[in-house]
Protein backbone atom coordinates (compact mmCIF):
# COMPACT_ATOMS: atom_id res chain seq x y z
CA UNK A 1 0.00 0.00 0.00
CA UNK A 2 1.43 3.39 -0.98
CA UNK A 3 1.88 6.32 1.37
CA UNK A 4 -0.83 8.24 -0.46
CA UNK A 5 -3.32 5.46 0.01
CA UNK A 6 -2.47 5.18 3.69
CA UNK A 7 -3.08 8.86 4.40
CA UNK A 8 -6.88 8.82 4.10
CA UNK A 9 -7.08 5.75 6.34
CA UNK A 10 -4.77 7.39 8.87
CA UNK A 11 -6.75 10.63 8.82
CA UNK A 12 -10.05 8.80 9.26
CA UNK A 13 -8.56 6.82 12.15
CA UNK A 14 -7.46 10.02 13.89
CA UNK A 15 -10.84 11.66 13.25
CA UNK A 16 -12.73 8.71 14.73
CA UNK A 17 -10.34 8.50 17.67
CA UNK A 18 -10.54 12.24 18.22
CA UNK A 19 -14.34 12.24 18.07
CA UNK A 20 -14.61 9.40 20.59
CA UNK A 21 -12.00 11.00 22.87
CA UNK A 22 -13.65 14.43 22.78
CA UNK A 23 -16.99 12.84 23.67
CA UNK A 24 -15.38 11.94 27.01
CA UNK A 25 -14.93 15.67 27.62
CA UNK A 26 -18.68 16.24 27.29
CA UNK A 27 -19.35 13.28 29.58
CA UNK A 28 -16.94 14.56 32.24
CA UNK A 29 -18.24 18.15 32.10
CA UNK A 30 -21.81 16.90 32.36
CA UNK A 31 -20.86 14.77 35.38
CA UNK A 32 -19.18 17.73 37.11
CA UNK A 33 -21.88 20.28 36.28
CA UNK A 34 -24.05 19.33 39.24
CA UNK A 35 -21.49 20.13 41.94
CA UNK A 36 -18.74 22.47 40.73
CA UNK A 37 -18.28 25.91 39.22
CA UNK A 38 -17.65 25.96 35.48
CA UNK A 39 -14.64 28.27 35.81
CA UNK A 40 -13.07 25.86 38.32
CA UNK A 41 -13.58 22.95 35.92
CA UNK A 42 -12.18 24.92 32.98
CA UNK A 43 -9.12 26.02 34.98
CA UNK A 44 -8.18 22.47 35.98
CA UNK A 45 -8.93 21.22 32.47
CA UNK A 46 -6.73 23.95 30.97
CA UNK A 47 -3.80 23.08 33.25
CA UNK A 48 -4.02 19.42 32.22
CA UNK A 49 -4.43 20.34 28.56
CA UNK A 50 -1.53 22.79 28.73
CA UNK A 51 0.72 20.10 30.20
CA UNK A 52 -0.05 17.88 27.20
CA UNK A 53 0.52 20.72 24.71
CA UNK A 54 3.84 21.70 26.32
CA UNK A 55 4.93 18.06 26.32
CA UNK A 56 4.24 17.73 22.60
CA UNK A 57 6.02 21.03 21.89
CA UNK A 58 9.03 19.95 23.97
CA UNK A 59 9.51 16.79 21.91
CA UNK A 60 8.73 18.41 18.54
CA UNK A 61 11.43 19.31 16.02
CA UNK A 62 10.87 23.07 16.17
CA UNK A 63 10.33 23.18 19.94
CA UNK A 64 9.16 26.39 21.56
CA UNK A 65 10.25 28.48 18.56
CA UNK A 66 6.92 27.67 16.95
CA UNK A 67 5.11 29.74 19.59
CA UNK A 68 6.41 32.99 18.10
CA UNK A 69 3.58 34.88 16.48
CA UNK A 70 3.11 38.01 14.42
CA UNK A 71 -0.66 38.04 14.95
CA UNK A 72 -1.35 38.67 18.65
CA UNK A 73 -4.61 40.53 18.02
CA UNK A 74 -5.95 37.71 15.85
CA UNK A 75 -5.07 35.26 18.61
CA UNK A 76 -6.83 37.46 21.17
CA UNK A 77 -10.00 37.56 19.07
CA UNK A 78 -9.92 33.83 18.33
CA UNK A 79 -9.32 32.93 21.98
CA UNK A 80 -12.22 35.18 22.99
CA UNK A 81 -14.74 33.51 20.70
CA UNK A 82 -13.47 30.04 21.65
CA UNK A 83 -14.03 30.90 25.31
CA UNK A 84 -17.55 32.20 24.64
CA UNK A 85 -18.24 29.02 22.67
CA UNK A 86 -17.07 26.82 25.54
CA UNK A 87 -18.90 28.70 28.30
CA UNK A 88 -22.24 28.84 26.48
CA UNK A 89 -21.99 25.20 25.39
CA UNK A 90 -21.16 23.87 28.84
CA UNK A 91 -23.82 25.95 30.57
CA UNK A 92 -26.33 24.63 28.04
CA UNK A 93 -24.99 21.10 28.47
CA UNK A 94 -25.56 21.30 32.22
CA UNK A 95 -29.26 21.94 31.59
CA UNK A 96 -29.94 19.59 28.65
CA UNK A 97 -29.70 15.85 28.05
CA UNK A 98 -26.24 15.06 26.65
CA UNK A 99 -27.48 13.85 23.26
CA UNK A 100 -29.74 16.89 22.80
CA UNK A 101 -26.88 19.31 23.48
CA UNK A 102 -24.45 17.53 21.16
CA UNK A 103 -27.02 17.31 18.36
CA UNK A 104 -27.81 21.02 18.61
CA UNK A 105 -24.08 21.84 18.56
CA UNK A 106 -23.69 19.85 15.32
CA UNK A 107 -25.40 22.74 13.52
CA UNK A 108 -21.88 24.27 13.44
CA UNK A 109 -20.90 22.66 10.07
CA UNK A 110 -24.02 24.19 8.55
CA UNK A 111 -23.06 27.58 9.98
CA UNK A 112 -19.59 27.16 8.48
CA UNK A 113 -21.27 26.70 5.09
CA UNK A 114 -23.36 29.83 5.68
CA UNK A 115 -20.35 31.88 6.77
CA UNK A 116 -18.25 30.61 3.88
CA UNK A 117 -20.81 32.05 1.48
CA UNK A 118 -21.38 35.33 3.31
CA UNK A 119 -17.89 36.10 4.64
CA UNK A 120 -15.49 34.23 2.34
CA UNK A 121 -17.69 34.65 -0.76
CA UNK A 122 -17.41 30.96 -1.56
CA UNK A 123 -19.97 29.54 -3.96
CA UNK A 124 -22.74 27.53 -2.29
CA UNK A 125 -25.20 25.75 -4.56
CA UNK A 126 -28.96 25.37 -4.04
CA UNK A 127 -28.66 21.82 -2.69
CA UNK A 128 -26.34 22.88 0.11
CA UNK A 129 -28.59 25.86 0.88
CA UNK A 130 -31.47 23.38 1.11
CA UNK A 131 -29.41 21.26 3.53
CA UNK A 132 -28.78 24.35 5.67
CA UNK A 133 -32.53 25.04 5.72
CA UNK A 134 -33.32 21.45 6.73
CA UNK A 135 -30.71 21.62 9.48
CA UNK A 136 -32.24 24.83 10.78
CA UNK A 137 -35.62 23.11 10.98
CA UNK A 138 -33.92 20.50 13.13
CA UNK A 139 -32.56 23.28 15.33
CA UNK A 140 -36.05 24.71 15.79
CA UNK A 141 -37.25 21.26 16.85
CA UNK A 142 -34.38 20.92 19.35
CA UNK A 143 -35.29 24.26 20.97
CA UNK A 144 -38.72 22.74 21.78
CA UNK A 145 -40.73 25.93 21.30
CA UNK A 146 -44.03 24.39 22.41
CA UNK A 147 -46.53 26.84 23.87
CA UNK A 148 -44.33 29.68 22.63
CA UNK A 149 -41.52 28.96 25.11
CA UNK A 150 -38.00 28.51 23.68
CA UNK A 151 -35.64 26.39 25.77
CA UNK A 152 -32.89 28.79 26.97
CA UNK A 153 -30.29 26.01 27.16
CA UNK A 154 -30.71 25.25 23.46
CA UNK A 155 -30.23 28.93 22.61
CA UNK A 156 -26.96 28.90 24.56
CA UNK A 157 -25.77 25.86 22.59
CA UNK A 158 -26.70 27.64 19.34
CA UNK A 159 -24.63 30.65 20.41
CA UNK A 160 -21.80 28.21 21.10
CA UNK A 161 -22.16 26.66 17.64
CA UNK A 162 -22.04 30.11 16.02
CA UNK A 163 -18.85 30.99 17.93
CA UNK A 164 -17.36 27.58 17.11
CA UNK A 165 -18.01 28.14 13.41
CA UNK A 166 -16.52 31.63 13.70
CA UNK A 167 -13.38 30.17 15.25
CA UNK A 168 -13.04 27.94 12.17
CA UNK A 169 -13.18 31.06 10.01
CA UNK A 170 -10.39 32.59 12.10
CA UNK A 171 -8.35 29.39 11.87
CA UNK A 172 -8.61 29.48 8.08
CA UNK A 173 -7.51 33.09 8.13
CA UNK A 174 -4.47 32.31 10.32
CA UNK A 175 -3.48 28.90 8.95
CA UNK A 176 -0.64 30.13 6.72
CA UNK A 177 1.35 31.75 9.53
CA UNK A 178 0.29 29.94 12.73
CA UNK A 179 0.84 26.27 13.59
CA UNK A 180 -1.75 24.07 15.26
CA UNK A 181 0.40 24.03 18.40
CA UNK A 182 0.51 27.84 18.47
CA UNK A 183 -3.26 28.09 18.16
CA UNK A 184 -3.77 25.47 20.88
CA UNK A 185 -1.21 27.04 23.22
CA UNK A 186 -2.81 30.48 23.17
CA UNK A 187 -6.28 29.01 23.70
CA UNK A 188 -5.09 27.18 26.80
CA UNK A 189 -3.38 30.36 28.03
CA UNK A 190 -6.65 32.23 27.60
CA UNK A 191 -8.60 29.61 29.53
CA UNK A 192 -6.10 29.67 32.40
CA UNK A 193 -5.98 33.47 32.69
CA UNK A 194 -9.72 34.09 32.39
CA UNK A 195 -10.90 31.21 34.59
CA UNK A 196 -8.30 32.02 37.26
CA UNK A 197 -9.29 35.70 37.25
CA UNK A 198 -12.99 34.82 37.39
CA UNK A 199 -12.32 32.39 40.21
CA UNK A 200 -10.51 35.05 42.24
CA UNK A 201 -13.46 37.39 41.71
CA UNK A 202 -16.42 35.02 42.11
CA UNK A 203 -14.96 31.83 43.57
CA UNK A 204 -16.21 32.71 47.05
CA UNK A 205 -19.78 32.22 45.84
CA UNK A 206 -21.09 35.76 46.35
CA UNK A 207 -22.60 35.61 42.84
CA UNK A 208 -24.10 32.14 43.31
CA UNK A 209 -27.47 31.60 41.63
CA UNK A 210 -30.52 29.74 42.89
CA UNK A 211 -30.51 25.95 42.32
CA UNK A 212 -31.93 25.09 38.90
CA UNK A 213 -31.32 28.54 37.41
CA UNK A 214 -29.68 28.90 34.00
CA UNK A 215 -26.40 30.33 35.31
CA UNK A 216 -26.02 28.16 38.42
CA UNK A 217 -23.13 26.18 36.88
CA UNK A 218 -21.21 29.36 36.05
CA UNK A 219 -21.41 31.16 39.39
CA UNK A 220 -21.03 28.41 41.99
CA UNK A 221 -18.32 28.81 44.65
CA UNK A 222 -15.12 26.81 44.36
CA UNK A 223 -14.43 23.89 46.64
CA UNK A 224 -11.74 21.22 46.85
CA UNK A 225 -12.88 18.11 44.94
CA UNK A 226 -12.89 14.81 46.82
CA UNK A 227 -10.65 12.08 45.45
CA UNK A 228 -13.63 10.33 43.88
CA UNK A 229 -14.24 13.26 41.50
CA UNK A 230 -10.70 13.72 40.24
CA UNK A 231 -11.23 11.18 37.46
CA UNK A 232 -13.66 13.59 35.79
CA UNK A 233 -11.33 16.58 36.08
CA UNK A 234 -8.43 14.58 34.64
CA UNK A 235 -10.66 13.05 31.95
CA UNK A 236 -11.80 16.41 30.62
CA UNK A 237 -8.22 17.74 30.45
CA UNK A 238 -6.78 14.64 28.82
CA UNK A 239 -9.73 14.35 26.42
CA UNK A 240 -9.35 17.93 25.21
CA UNK A 241 -5.56 17.68 24.95
CA UNK A 242 -5.37 14.29 23.23
CA UNK A 243 -8.62 14.60 21.24
CA UNK A 244 -7.68 18.04 19.97
CA UNK A 245 -4.28 16.83 18.80
CA UNK A 246 -5.85 13.81 17.07
CA UNK A 247 -8.29 16.05 15.22
CA UNK A 248 -5.47 18.39 14.21
CA UNK A 249 -3.49 15.43 12.87
CA UNK A 250 -6.54 14.17 10.97
CA UNK A 251 -7.03 17.50 9.19
CA UNK A 252 -3.28 17.89 8.62
CA UNK A 253 -2.88 14.56 6.81
CA UNK A 254 -6.21 14.16 5.00
CA UNK A 255 -8.59 16.31 2.97
CA UNK A 256 -11.02 18.10 5.28
CA UNK A 257 -14.10 17.10 3.29
CA UNK A 258 -13.17 13.43 3.77
CA UNK A 259 -12.39 13.75 7.48
CA UNK A 260 -15.26 15.98 8.62
CA UNK A 261 -18.11 13.43 8.33
CA UNK A 262 -16.33 11.16 10.80
CA UNK A 263 -16.59 13.85 13.48
CA UNK A 264 -20.25 12.83 13.67
CA UNK A 265 -19.13 9.77 15.63
CA UNK A 266 -19.67 12.16 18.54
CA UNK A 267 -23.44 11.82 18.12
CA UNK A 268 -23.77 8.06 18.77
CA UNK A 269 -21.17 8.44 21.53
CA UNK A 270 -23.31 11.15 23.17
CA UNK A 271 -26.36 8.89 23.01
CA UNK A 272 -24.29 6.03 24.44
CA UNK A 273 -22.91 8.08 27.36
CA UNK A 274 -26.33 9.58 28.01
CA UNK A 275 -27.96 6.17 28.30
CA UNK A 276 -25.18 4.33 30.15
CA UNK A 277 -24.06 7.04 32.57
CA UNK A 278 -27.07 9.31 32.99
CA UNK A 279 -29.95 7.00 32.08
CA UNK A 280 -31.22 9.55 29.54
CA UNK A 281 -32.63 8.16 26.29
CA UNK A 282 -33.58 10.70 23.56
CA UNK A 283 -37.33 11.17 23.16
CA UNK A 284 -39.19 11.34 19.84
CA UNK A 285 -38.69 15.10 19.51
CA UNK A 286 -34.95 14.75 20.11
CA UNK A 287 -34.67 11.92 17.56
CA UNK A 288 -36.39 14.11 14.94
CA UNK A 289 -34.01 17.00 15.58
CA UNK A 290 -30.97 14.71 15.64
CA UNK A 291 -31.95 13.16 12.30
CA UNK A 292 -32.50 16.52 10.58
CA UNK A 293 -29.36 18.24 11.91
CA UNK A 294 -26.96 15.32 11.44
CA UNK A 295 -28.52 14.33 8.12
CA UNK A 296 -28.23 17.87 6.78
CA UNK A 297 -24.66 18.19 8.04
CA UNK A 298 -23.55 14.91 6.50
CA UNK A 299 -25.28 15.77 3.21
CA UNK A 300 -23.50 19.13 3.14
CA UNK A 301 -20.14 17.45 3.67
CA UNK A 302 -20.93 14.85 0.99
CA UNK A 303 -21.81 17.58 -1.53
CA UNK A 304 -18.58 19.37 -0.65
CA UNK A 305 -16.63 16.16 -1.36
CA UNK A 306 -18.32 15.78 -4.76
CA UNK A 307 -17.69 19.43 -5.61
CA UNK A 308 -13.99 19.20 -4.78
CA UNK A 309 -13.61 15.94 -6.72
CA UNK A 310 -15.25 17.58 -9.73
CA UNK A 311 -12.92 20.59 -9.44
CA UNK A 312 -9.89 18.27 -9.32
CA UNK A 313 -11.11 16.28 -12.33
CA UNK A 314 -11.55 19.49 -14.33
CA UNK A 315 -8.24 21.03 -13.24
CA UNK A 316 -6.02 17.96 -13.64
CA UNK A 317 -4.49 17.18 -17.06
CA UNK A 318 -5.47 13.87 -18.62
CA UNK A 319 -3.59 10.97 -17.03
CA UNK A 320 -2.59 12.86 -13.88
CA UNK A 321 -5.39 11.44 -11.73
Regions picked out by a protein language model, each given a short descriptive name:
Residues 10-16, 63-88, 152-158, 209-242, ...:
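Loop-to-transmembrane-helix transition segments
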Residues 19, 23, 54, 79-87, ...:
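Hydrophobic/small/kink-forming positions within alpha-helical transmembrane segments
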Residues 30, 53, 149-210, 219, ...:
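Transmembrane alpha-helical segments that form core, pore/gating elements
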Residues 35-84, 163-167, 187-203:
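Transmembrane alpha-helices of multi-pass small-molecule transport proteins
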Residues 102-107, 175-190, 241-275:
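Helix-helix packing/entry segments at the starts of transmembrane helices
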Residues 108-130, 268-286:
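C-terminal transmembrane-helix exit sites in multi-pass transporters
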Residues 127-144, 160, 285-304:
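Hydrophobic transmembrane alpha-helices of multi-pass small-molecule transport proteins
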Residues 268-321:
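C-terminal-most transmembrane helix of multi-pass membrane proteins
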Amino acid sequence: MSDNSRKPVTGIFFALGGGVTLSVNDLAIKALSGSYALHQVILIRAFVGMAIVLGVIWFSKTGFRQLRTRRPLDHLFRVSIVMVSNVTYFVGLSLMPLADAVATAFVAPLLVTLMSAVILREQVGPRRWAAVAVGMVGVVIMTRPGAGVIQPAAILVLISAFCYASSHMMTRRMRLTESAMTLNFFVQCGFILVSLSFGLFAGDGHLAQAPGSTWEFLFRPWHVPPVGDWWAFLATGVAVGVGGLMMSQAYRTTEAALVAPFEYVGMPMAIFWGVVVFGSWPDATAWAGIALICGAGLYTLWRETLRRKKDLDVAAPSGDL
